[in-house]
């Protein structure tokens, strides 16, 4: 009997259970959307010196289509014909057991889409309003070449799926509770399409505690700069001699006496600090879609 143990990473495990209590939903789009919570696994019990490859699939659950009605999900008719679940091999390829067990194994590059014609290798096609469950499979590999991916079923070391990672694929969130949870727990979730939340994350104004009146960086006019003081013309026939200068007067350059060609004084900068709204360089997830 295999001693291999697979579990969900602690913080993600907690999130999956929170979402599962309300029947989790995942947005599918033509361009693909990443899963949240993340699929991040911990694997124990592998042979440290043997080679393994790890594969993820999103398998259909049941044979029904679902709809959200009366504040809850319910089955409504037969499911559409499902294609074979796409095999997503982990990007790390074939590695020793010691390497796989060194840290968590995350499938954060996977995206789900409702566009069946996509050729994107990281995209998985799902039918909207159908339920799916992630399934992790660990294969023993005869070669360390990342292109030698094992396929035969007799090389399977372990398979793991967790009921609380089930979700229904949707094109827009149906349950307001799920919408609220996504906003609360996903730092990149950007709110509603009605514009209540800004699409860009901004830091507050430096000049006061409120940024409600702060203009955007694109609309801010540049600060006015005081013109430089004009310098009197230099007489090329006047040359200074050091012994003629007062000890308290600075030596001027290039050709005039200090009192004939004073240097312009440097304008002092304003002590007041400009109010700035700064765009953070941060990857932003698409808007949260909701019904209606």
Curated annotation (Swiss-Prot):
One of its GO terms (biological process) is regulation of transcription by RNA polymerase II. GO terms for cellular component: chromatin; nucleus; transcription regulator complex. PROSITE patterns: TBOX_1, TBOX_2, TBOX_3. Residues 10-194 bind DNA. Residues 280-292 have a biased composition (Acidic residues). Residues 204-223, 265-275 have a biased composition (Low complexity). One of its GO terms (molecular function) is RNA polymerase II transcription regulatory region sequence-specific DNA binding. The keyword Lipoprotein does not apply. Residues 192-227, 265-292 are annotated as: Disordered. InterPro entries: p53-like_TF_DNA-bd_sf, T-box_DNA-bd, T-box_sf, TF_T-box, TF_T-box_CS. Keywords: Developmental protein, DNA-binding, Nucleus, Transcription, Transcription regulation. It is found in: Nucleus. Disruption phenotype: RNAi-mediated knockdown causes about 5% embryonic lethality with 1-10% of hatching larvae displaying posterior morphological defects. Defective intercalation of dorsal hypodermis. Simultaneous RNAi-mediated knockdown of tbx-8 causes at least 48% of embryos to fail to hatch and those that do display severe morphological defects and die as larvae. Simultaneous RNAi-mediated knockdown of tbx-8 abolishes muscle expression of vab-7. RNAi-mediated knockdown at the larval L1 stage causes a decrease in expression of lin-39 at the larval L3 stage. The keyword Transferase does not apply. PANTHER family: T-BOX PROTEIN 33-RELATED, T-BOX PROTEIN-RELATED. Transcription factor. Involved in the control of early morphogenesis of the intestine, hypodermis and body-wall muscle. Involved in regulating expression of vab-7. Appears to have partially redundant function to tbx-8. Positively modulates expression of homeobox protein lin-39, perhaps by binding to regulatory regions of the lin-39 gene, acting in the vulval lineage. This is T-box transcription factor tbx-9. It comes from Caenorhabditis elegans. The gene is tbx-9.
């Amino acid at each position: 009997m295999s001693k291999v143990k697979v579990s969900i990473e602690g913080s993600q495990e907690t999130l999956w259970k929170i979402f599962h209590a309300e029947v989790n939903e995942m947005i599918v789009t033509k361009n693909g959307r990443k899963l949240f919570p993340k699929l991040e696994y911990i694997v124990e019990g592998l042979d440290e010196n043997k080679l393994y490859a790890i594969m993820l699939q999103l398998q259909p659950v049941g044979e029904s289509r679902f709809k959200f009605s009366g504040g809850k999900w319910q089955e409504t008719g037969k499911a559409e014909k499902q294609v074979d679940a796409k095999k997503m091999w982990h990007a790390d390829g074939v590695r020793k057991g010691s390497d796989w067990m060194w840290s968590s194994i995350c499938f954060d590059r996977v995206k789900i889409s409702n566009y069946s014609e996509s050729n994107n290798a990281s995209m998985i096609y799902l039918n909207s309003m159908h339920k799916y469950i992630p399934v992790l499979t660990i294969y023993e590999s005869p070669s360390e070449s990342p292109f030698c991916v094992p396929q035969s079923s007799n090389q399977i070391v372990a398979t793991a799926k967790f009921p609380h990672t089930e979700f229904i694929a949707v094109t827009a969130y149906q349950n307001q509770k799920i919408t609220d949870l996504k906003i609360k727990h996903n730092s990149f979730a950007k709110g509603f399409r009605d514009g209540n939340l800004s699409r860009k994350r901004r830091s507050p104004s430096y000049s006061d505690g409120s940024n409600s009146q702060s203009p955007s960086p694109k609309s801010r006019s540049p600060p006015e700069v005081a013109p430089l003081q004009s310098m009197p013309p230099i007489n090329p026939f006047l040359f200074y001699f050091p012994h003629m200068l007062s000890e308290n007067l600075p030596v001027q350059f290039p050709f005039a006496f200090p009192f004939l060609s004073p240097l312009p004084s440097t304008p002092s900068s304003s002590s007041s600090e400009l109010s700035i709204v700064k765009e953070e360089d941060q990857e932003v997830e698409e808007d949260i879609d909701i019904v209606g």
